[in-house]
């Protein structure tokens, strides 16, 4: 049995634990969240859990002007799904704990996974967990700005396509950002949702299940009870 910590060190450990917890707690951004009932420009976004990975789906017609030009094959898609992750782990045809560990400690770069959908998310992914979230126009634009910034660009400012994606009409693109044990694909989704102004805590979103829990609890708004737009 180890020796007990001196009292002052025990207080220090407890204080650090409290500080870490408080650092993870966030508040709503009042200029973006919550959306107002009846406000012009409210949008619906969808959060999708595929098991290990989560993604964000937006209506293409509402988003395309704020995103980099993507492949022409996506021009007819009604919706776009975005996910982010380690290039080795995300692009692998099968998930494994070995690949996950390698990504966590020695990532070789990151990618964005973009999927073109013709049907609404719940229909396109009948076996996935899907949460629909209403966001304000300011929150929607801030979220899309973060997604756009995640694309690594070529000298002409275009997105850098890497090849076909994992399912459907999808493609991988070279991405910005560093993947590590404390910042995973699910952390990225939570941080991107945070741009809508909702009080989701990215530091807690290490798993797909936590992303969905927080999205459902903190980001979903009952507009029937929301304050009306002025």
Where are these regions (language model features)?
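Bacterial N-terminal signal peptides that target proteins for export
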Residues: 2-16
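Amphipathic, soluble alpha/beta structural segments
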Residues: 12, 48, 228-230
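C-terminal motif of bacterial Sec signal peptides marking the signal peptidase cleavage site
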Residues: 21-24
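Activation targets extended, charge/polar-rich intrinsically disordered C-terminal tails
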Residues: 27, 149-230
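Non-catalytic ligand/cofactor/substrate-binding and regulatory segments of enzyme domains
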Residues: 30-48, 59-174
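A short, compositionally biased
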Residues: 50-52
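Short beta-strand scaffold segments in enzyme catalytic cores
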Residues: 55-57
């Amino acid at each position: 049995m180890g020796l007990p910590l001196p009292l002052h060190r025990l207080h220090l450990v407890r204080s650090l634990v409290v500080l870490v917890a408080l650092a993870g707690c966030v508040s709503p951004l009042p200029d973006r969240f919550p959306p107002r009932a009846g406000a012009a420009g409210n949008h619906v976004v969808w959060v999708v859990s595929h098991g290990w990975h989560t993604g964000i789906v937006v209506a293409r017609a509402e988003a395309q002007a704020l995103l980099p030009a993507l492949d022409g094959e996506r021009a007819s898609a009604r919706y776009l799904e975005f996910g982010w992750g380690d290039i080795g782990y995300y692009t692998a045809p099968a998930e494994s704990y070995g690949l996950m560990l390698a990504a966590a400690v020695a990532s070789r770069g990151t990618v964005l996974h973009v999927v073109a959908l013709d049907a609404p998310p719940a229909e396109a992914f009948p076996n996935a967990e899907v949460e629909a979230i209403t966001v304000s126009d300011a929150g929607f634009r801030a979220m899309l700005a973060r997604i756009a910034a995640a694309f690594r660009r070529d000298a002409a400012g275009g997105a850098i396509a890497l090849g076909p994606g994992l399912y459907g009409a999808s493609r991988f693109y070279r991405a910005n950002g560093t993947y590590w044990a404390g910042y995973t694909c699910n952390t990225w989704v939570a941080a991107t949702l945070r741009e809508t102004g909702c009080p989701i805590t990215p530091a807690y979103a290490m798993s797909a299940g936590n992303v969905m829990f927080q999205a459902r609890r903190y980001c979903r708004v009952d507009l029937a009870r929301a304050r009306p737009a002025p």
